[in-house]
Design a protein with these regions (language model features):
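Beta/alpha (TIM)-barrel catalytic core signal, keyed to glycine-rich beta->alpha loops juxtaposed to Asp/Glu
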Residues: 2-18, 150-323
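Alpha-helix N-cap and loop-to-helix initiation/capping positions
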Residues: 46-50, 78, 82, 113-121, ...
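Short, acidic/polar
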Residues: 45-59, 117-133, 181-185
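N-terminal binding-site loop/beta-alpha segment at the start of enzyme catalytic domains
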Residues: 1-98
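Active-site gating/metal-coordination segments in enzymes
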Residues: 110-142, 201-205
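Conserved, mostly hydrophobic/aromatic
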Residues: 24, 36, 51, 58, ...
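N-terminal small/glycine-rich loop or linker at the start of catalytic domains
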Residues: 25-43, 101-114, 137, 142
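Structural motif
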Residues: 57, 61, 133, 165-166, ...
């Protein structure tokens, strides 16, 4: 930022473009291999100036994709409000250089219409999201989860209509079972709104998208794939190799339980950490590189609590090829 506090993006932000970007499926969209997730660290309870510094660093280094959802915070909606404030304060001149996504599918407000995959919920949720983010449209809108009680046609047609209304440019789905993914792919293609991307958990400890055929289906049908929770809530870092830090997620036992760190897992993590050291990488860098080197993967969603953490994570783009 200049002396008046006005943000000016780094003139060299695309200098590493050849290494950083990858085509998403068969679309015209190139996504950064590392995308910035707003699940944590961008809520009302978090420092706005820190959020600002992280997004500045990201964009200054070519990370153009910011991933949000209606219920990110806490509290719900506050990550999108932070994005709206960032747009107003810093990123409005760069809107056409950003690829912003949001989602709807989990509980957001009280009553029968604030959850799941109904047309009413999806339409209302996106309208609210756009207001919070000070945007006329999002680049990508997701169904955040599969709804077993709403006809898939209702959910998908609502998403098609959202594109037709100009409120989203592309469509994605997250964590749908394979058969529902196949149905969505065909339904959307027939309506000239092809599925851009699928989002799911994939990391060195969780291979479900590979084991259940989802990743292969995406690769074979020109659908991008973006991984969340790439570091398994911090397990795939050096944070827990010598005990449980008092300020860690595992110490709070909210998303990550003590029971997750079994003696067998700890032994495996220490082996991987040693392997990473032999590669002159941290365990986190190697874990991110592993995902990016899997067939069919377009991008990895990372969170960041500091610019230093984001800087370290970005090194995986230039990582050496892993043996397996």
């Amino acid at each position: 930022m200049d002396i008046k506090g006005i943000y000016h993006a780094d003139a060299n932000r695309y200098s590493d473009a050849e290494a950083l970007y990858k085509r998403c499926g068969k679309s015209g969209i190139l996504l950064p291999k590392i995308s910035l997730g707003f699940w944590h660290n961008f809520g009302e309870v978090d420092s706005y100036e820190r959020s600002r510094a992280i997004t500045h660093y990201a964009f200054d280094h070519g990370i153009t994709h910011f991933d949000l959802a209606n219920n990110y915070g806490p509290p719900y909606g506050s990550a999108e409000e932070t994005m709206g404030r960032l747009m107003k304060d810093d990123f409005k001149p760069y809107r056409d250089e950003l690829f912003i996504s949001t989602k709807a599918g989990y509980d957001m407000w009280e009553g029968p219409y604030g959850n799941w995959g109904s047309r009413k919920y999806l339409m209302a949720s996106l309208n609210q999201s756009l207001k919070r983010m000070n945007l006329e449209y999002v680049d990508l809108f997701y169904s955040h989860r599969y709804d077993p009680n709403t006809p898939l046609e209702e959910t998908l047609q609502a998403m098609v209509d959202i594109v037709k209304q100009g409120k989203a440019l592309y469509l994605g789905i997250s964590r749908w079972p394979l058969e529902a993914l196949k149905f969505a792919d065909q339904y959307l293609k027939e309506r000239d709104c092809p599925l851009l991307i699928f989002q799911d958990r994939l990391n060195m400890l969780d291979h479900a998208p590979q084991e259940n055929g989802t990743l292969d289906y995406c690769a074979e049908n020109d659908i991008g794939f973006i991984s969340f929770s790439p570091l398994a809530q911090g397990l795939l870092t050096d944070r827990y190799l010598n005990g449980i830090p008092a300020d860690s997620r595992m110490a709070k036992e909210h998303f990550l339980k003590h029971s997750a760190l079994t003696p067998e897992l700890l032994e495996q993590l220490k082996k991987w950490n040693a392997e990473a050291g032999e590669r002159d990488e941290t365990l986190a860098e190697m874990a991110l590189a592993w995902i990016l080197q899997q067939k069919g993967v377009t991008s990895v969603l990372v969170g960041a609590s500091s610019t230093a953490q984001l800087e370290k994570n970005m090194k995986c783009v230039h990582a050496k090829t892993l043996n397996s």
